[in-house]
UniProtKB/Swiss-Prot annotation:
Record domain Ig-like C2-type: where: 48-105, 134-200, 237-302, 330-383, 417-470
Keywords of the record: Cell adhesion, Disulfide bond, Glycoprotein, Immunoglobulin domain, Membrane, Phagocytosis, Repeat, Signal, Transmembrane, Transmembrane helix
Recorded family membership: Belongs to the immunoglobulin superfamily. ICAM family.
Any one annotated GO CC term: plasma membrane
Protein species of origin: Bos taurus
Gene, per the UniProt record: ICAM3
Name of this protein: Intercellular adhesion molecule 3
Role noted for this protein: ICAM proteins are ligands for the leukocyte adhesion protein LFA-1 (integrin alpha-L/beta-2). ICAM3 is also a ligand for integrin alpha-D/beta-2. In association with integrin alpha-L/beta-2, contributes to apoptotic neutrophil phagocytosis by macrophages.
Native organism taxonomy: Eukaryota, Metazoa, Chordata, Craniata, Vertebrata
Length: 544
């Protein structure tokens, strides 16, 4: 590998040598008709490689041939009219001179050596850790060494795509800068620099060298702040949900989100979907008063933060108690509704005298109080907001069984082979067992369910409700009426006779009506006037 050009010492040595050579030439030599050929002519040589130079004198009777150069040289071979020299270490561009004697005159020939070398280093300057989408970004390619610079250029690559190309300057090391506008799709894309040494015009080839790639990370952060969702009023020592989200992030999966309550970091569950990042946590506090909850979202080199306040309060109670939850009928019962300081309680619509004091209700347990529900309402004012909490409790009263006379008739009259329900009911606490048994036979009739009534169900039944609190009895008379076949036959006979009589009467009536249409009333014959028929044909027809 070589530097961008030959050392300054080589240039100065060559220049001095050429000036001296020109000055020493005889006048006749400057107008020479003979020449010295230098081969190869204007060669392109790899840096540090040896080069064999052949000097040939085109004249009859050639004399001594020599090679003048500042480079290290050694004789290689020689013949009539020619001499070859080996340059052992070509490290820079320079002009070499071959000279010889022809007809006692000195003639010279020149050749320019061009040294080429690949860059020692091709590197893409470090990229920013994160680059905002759409903002201009300057990417720099650094190249050390390489020659000839006139044939050396630098290409910026995005993956395998060529983004730009620039010639390489002469400074050492050389720096070439390209401007790009990163896109979202450039996130995670590799960028690199490629040097190109194009020696195809010198009969060689195109030499390329690519730097190590660097990955670009792009991001997009919205201008809006995260959205916090949580209850504004928190009861102490109770867990509450906290939710924070931010839309418009890219890439959302690379963003970081934190939730904090005061100085306490919350253990949040983070989920990213499309361009949205969401954090969910549960939190509780043991400190009463106003506190701050913070949500912070970081992406790239930017962050967005939201701070909001909450109020933590202590709401003790209400506690609703019964002096006897299962009271015997007739015993006194005290109902108490109590809560913490500054809490106003109300028992069944009756408030306590002052906040912080309990409310009480006293009663004597009766059957009507069984399953009675008492309600306690507690209110607490926090920063101008009234908070409510309710409790309820049920009283059970123990009392003996009672059969409901209104629903259990003492006398029943039913038809045989019909479906009926004995609607007797009993109340009490504990719930009594009710059964109805026929006196004498202890035959049990179903209670409360449909059954088929038979003729032998007739009789007097003793219905008894029993529980651990006592018993209650009542008598029910059941009269089942059977179906009589004789009576049915008599009824059918009577109906048949009535039908015959009706039919006979109808026949007589019809006959009488028809006879009425066939009767003619005639006036007795007069001795004076002779009767003549006004309708002789009709009468004749009727008589006939």
């Amino acid at each position: 590998m070589i530097a961008s050009g030959p050392p300054p010492r080589v240039y100065w040595t060559s220049l001095i040598f050429l000036l001296l050579a020109c000055c020493l030439l005889p006048t006749g030599a400057q107008g020479q008709t003979y020449q010295v050929r230098v081969e190869p002519k204007d060669p392109v040589v790899p840096f540090g490689e040896p080069l064999v130079v052949n000097c040939t004198l085109d004249c009859p009777g050639p004399g001594l041939i020599s090679l003048e150069t500042a480079l290290s040289k050694e004789p290689h071979s020689r013949g009539l009219g020619w001499a070859a020299f080996r340059l052992t270490n070509v490290t820079g561009d320079m002009e070499i001179l071959c000279s010889g004697i022809c007809n006692k005159s000195q003639v010279v020939g020149f050749s320019n050596i061009t040294v080429f070398g690949f860059p020692k280093r091709v590197e893409l300057a470090p990229l920013p850790l994160w680059q905002p989408v759409g903002e201009e970004l300057n990417l720099s390619c650094l190249v050390s060494g390489g020659a000839p610079r006139a044939h050396l250029s630098v290409v910026l690559l995005r993956g395998e795509e060529e983004l730009g190309r620039q010639p390489l300057g002469k400074e050492e090391p050389a720096k070439v800068t390209f401007m790009v506008q990163p896109r979202r799709e450039d996130h995670g894309t590799n960028f690199s620099c490629r040097s190109e040494l194009d020696l195809r015009s010198q009969g060689l080839e195109l030499f390329q060298n690519t730097s190590a790639p660097r990955k670009l990370q792009t991001y997009a952060m919205p201008k809006t702040a995260p959205r916090l969702v949580f209850p504004r009023f928190w009861e102490m020592e109770t867990s509450w949900p906290v939710n924070c989200s931010l839309n418009g992030l890219f890439p959302a999966s690379e963003a970081h989100i934190q939730l904090a309550l005061g100085n306490q970091m919350l253990n949040a569950t983070v989920v990213s979907h499309a361009d949205t990042l969401t954090a969910t946590a549960t939190a509780k506090t043991e400190q009463e008063g106003t506190q701050e909850i913070v949500c912070n979202v970081t992406l790239g080199v930017e962050n967005r933060e939201t701070r909001e306040s909450l109020v933590a309060y202590r709401f003790q109670g209400p506690n609703l108690n019964l002096s006897e939850s299962n009271a015997t009928e007739g015993t006194p019962v005290t109902v108490t509704c109590a809560a913490g300081p500054q809490v106003q309680v109300m028992l069944d619509g009756v408030p306590a005298a002052v906040p912080g004091q309990p409310a009480q209700l006293q009663l004597k347990a009766t059957e009507m109080d069984d399953r009675r529900t008492f309600f306690c309402n507690a209110t607490l004012k926090v920063h101008g907001v009234t908070l409510h909490r309710n409790r309820s409790i049920q009283l059970r009263v123990l009392y003996g069984p009672t059969i409901d006379r209104a629903k259990c008739p003492q006398r029943l009259m039913w038809k045989e082979k019909t479906m009926h329900i004995l609607q007797c009911q009993a109340r009490g606490n504990p719930n009594p067992q009710l059964q109805c048994l026929r006196e004498g036979s202890k035959f049990k009739v179903p209670v409360g369910i449909p059954f088929l009534v038979l003729l032998n169900y007739s009789g007097t039944y003793s219905c008894q409700a029993a529980s651990s609190r006592g018993t209650d009895k009542m008598l029910v008379m059941m009269d089942v009426q059977g179906r009589n076949p004789v009576t049915i036959n008599i009824v059918l006979g009577v109906l048949a006779i009535l039908g015959l009589v009706t039919l006979a009467a109808a026949s007589v009536y019809v006959f009488w009506v028809q006879r009425q249409h066939d009767i003619y009333h005639l006036t007795p014959r007069s001795t004076r006037w002779r009767l003549t028929s006004t309708q002789p044909v009709t009468v004749a027809e009727e008589l006939s």
